[in-house]
């Protein structure tokens, strides 16, 4: 029996990148999936590619009525809701605090935090009646470690992680599990957009992001290869499945080790300099 046989999932931001790959994995494992995005042409084409197990609904997740309609669509089309994956995102350029644009901040929060709460709200109403369900929010290592990403994005992701824990404490008694995934540097169009590429070009050429990430992996990441969308999709599969039935309130970090510390290979030159400096400062040391 396939892992998600008979289950129904809604995945926001699923017309490209992590969301699209997760939809493919879920369908392959037996789920019915609602594809969610703003680009109708791309979404309809992707749903057709996945076949009868998929349906597309155009949604702006920053609009609460759209989020409700998205959940209603899943229930009307497939009869139930077993998993909501809050994955939609928007690019956010780095800005220094003194030049902060509060309108831009609000726009980022609307997608990365407010939409997460809206999704939880309407998914929980359905799942509570069923007595079971899994809500997954795609957060980021920027939500647990400062300095890697923009302030707006990082703050919203940090809040989404804590919202996940709060929701887990409330919804557990209703049989609903709530967890988050914090990806590291993953080769996606979203990453390429953050690096300044145009949206269409970025979505169609994730290999550009992979090349950029490859240039810093040796210094930043203990695992010496580039994270890919399938790494996150497989993590989502675990959290959506019954294999994670005893997991809730957890932020599952999938980042190649970036957030764990500083790679030994990267730190070695500084460590050697540190010891040479100590030796040179000792009394009687010969230059």
Located regions from the model:
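Conserved glycine-rich cofactor-binding loop
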Residues: 8, 15-16
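Substrate-binding pocket helix/loop in short-chain dehydrogenase/reductase
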Residues: 95-97, 101-109, 217
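Active-site helix of classical SDR
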Residues: 120, 156, 164
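Alpha-helical segment proximal to the catalytic Tyr-Lys
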Residues: 125, 169-170, 245
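Residue(s) in the substrate-gating loop at a strand-loop-helix junction
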Residues: 140
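Short, small/polar-rich loop/turn modules that mediate ligand/substrate recognition or access, typified
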Residues: 172, 177, 247-249
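C-terminal helical subdomain
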Residues: 180, 203-243, 247, 254-256, ...
